[in-house]
């Protein structure tokens, strides 16, 4: 799967205040609109709740044949036999996660400094940001200049994350990205299908999708 990884429209999903039914409907409509990969990010749930929700999201992703990743929790990814995991700089090292998960799983890594490119061995893609301030990333923004430098030097695909919406996609035009990761632009939209469809159109207009 990692050799055919479509990162173009990457959805980072959290249930938040939505009912489970509403949450899953939002994800399904987003997939129909063009989301190509989903990462389940649940900081507030305990392991058992995370696992149970993960089973349902995984079933949905399998039905539409898109990759399903878990944020941070290698143990949950293993328990679910998810397609992979996304790790932050303070999470388990990539080489250890790779040893646990095996060669066929997808591992993404958050990165925001050029010097961190020296330590990405074993990762399949990078998530770089935040591009704009968000409720979860209020500080430590990544400049577009630095994002562009990281994209040009990275041997693996790079996804921009953090406050990305349709307007931001115009600012990202020409940067050597493999895709963008969104949260609120889809999860808070009145119509997740239309939101995803419009984002996908803008992605194809503005990004080379290397």
Curated annotation (Swiss-Prot):
It catalyses: 2-[(2R,5Z)-2-carboxy-4-methylthiazol-5(2H)-ylidene]ethyl phosphate + 4-amino-2-methyl-5-(diphosphooxymethyl)pyrimidine + 2 H(+) = thiamine phosphate + CO2 + diphosphate; 2-(2-carboxy-4-methylthiazol-5-yl)ethyl phosphate + 4-amino-2-methyl-5-(diphosphooxymethyl)pyrimidine + 2 H(+) = thiamine phosphate + CO2 + diphosphate; 4-methyl-5-(2-phosphooxyethyl)-thiazole + 4-amino-2-methyl-5-(diphosphooxymethyl)pyrimidine + H(+) = thiamine phosphate + diphosphate. Pathway: Cofactor biosynthesis; thiamine diphosphate biosynthesis; thiamine phosphate from 4-amino-2-methyl-5-diphosphomethylpyrimidine and 4-methyl-5-(2-phosphoethyl)-thiazole: step 1/1. Its EC number is 2.5.1.3. This is Thiamine-phosphate synthase. Mg(2+) binds at residues 72, 91. It comes from the Bacteria. The keyword Ribosomal protein does not apply. InterPro entries: Aldolase_TIM (IPR013785), ThiamineP_synth_sf (IPR036206), ThiamineP_synth_TenI (IPR022998), TMP_synthase (IPR034291). Signal peptide: none annotated. CDD domains: TMP_TenI. GO terms for cellular component: cytoplasm. It comes from Campylobacter jejuni subsp. jejuni serotype O:23/36 (strain 81-176). One of its GO terms (biological process) is thiamine diphosphate biosynthetic process. 2-[(2R,5Z)-2-carboxy-4-methylthiazol-5(2H)-ylidene]ethyl phosphate binds at residues 134-136, 163. 4-amino-2-methyl-5-(diphosphooxymethyl)pyrimidine binds at residues 39-43, 71, 110, 137. PANTHER family: THIAMINE BIOSYNTHETIC BIFUNCTIONAL ENZYME, THIAMINE-PHOSPHATE PYROPHOSPHORYLASE. It is an enzyme of class 2 (transferase). Condenses 4-methyl-5-(beta-hydroxyethyl)thiazole monophosphate (THZ-P) and 2-methyl-4-amino-5-hydroxymethyl pyrimidine pyrophosphate (HMP-PP) to form thiamine monophosphate (TMP). The keyword Coiled coil does not apply. Its cofactor is Mg(2+). Keywords: Magnesium, Metal-binding, Thiamine biosynthesis, Transferase.
């Amino acid at each position: 799967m990692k050799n055919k990884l479509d990162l173009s429209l990457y959805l980072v999903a959290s249930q938040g205040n939505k009912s489970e039914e509403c949450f899953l409907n939002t994800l399904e409509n987003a997939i129909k609109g063009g989301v190509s990969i989903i990462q389940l990010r649940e900081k507030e749930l305990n392991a058992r709740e995370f696992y149970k929700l993960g089973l349902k999201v995984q079933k949905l992703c399998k039905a539409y044949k898109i990759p399903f990743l878990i944020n941070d929790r290698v143990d949950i990814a293993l328990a679910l036999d998810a397609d992979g995991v996304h790790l932050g700089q303070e999470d388990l090292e990539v080489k250890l996660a790779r040893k646990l998960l095996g060669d066929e799983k997808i591992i993404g890594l958050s990165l925001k400094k050029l010097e961190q490119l020296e330590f990405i061995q074993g990762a399949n893609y990078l998530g770089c940001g935040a591009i704009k301030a968000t409720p979860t990333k209020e500080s430590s923004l990544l400049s577009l200049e630095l994002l562009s430098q990281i994209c040009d030097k990275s041997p693996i695909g790079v996804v921009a994350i953090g406050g990305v919406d349709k307007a931001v996609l115009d600012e990202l035009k020409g940067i050597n990205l493999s895709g963008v990761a969104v949260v609120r632009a889809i999860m808070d939209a009145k119509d997740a299908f239309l939101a995803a469809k419009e984002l996908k159109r803008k992605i194809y207009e503005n990004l080379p999708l290397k």
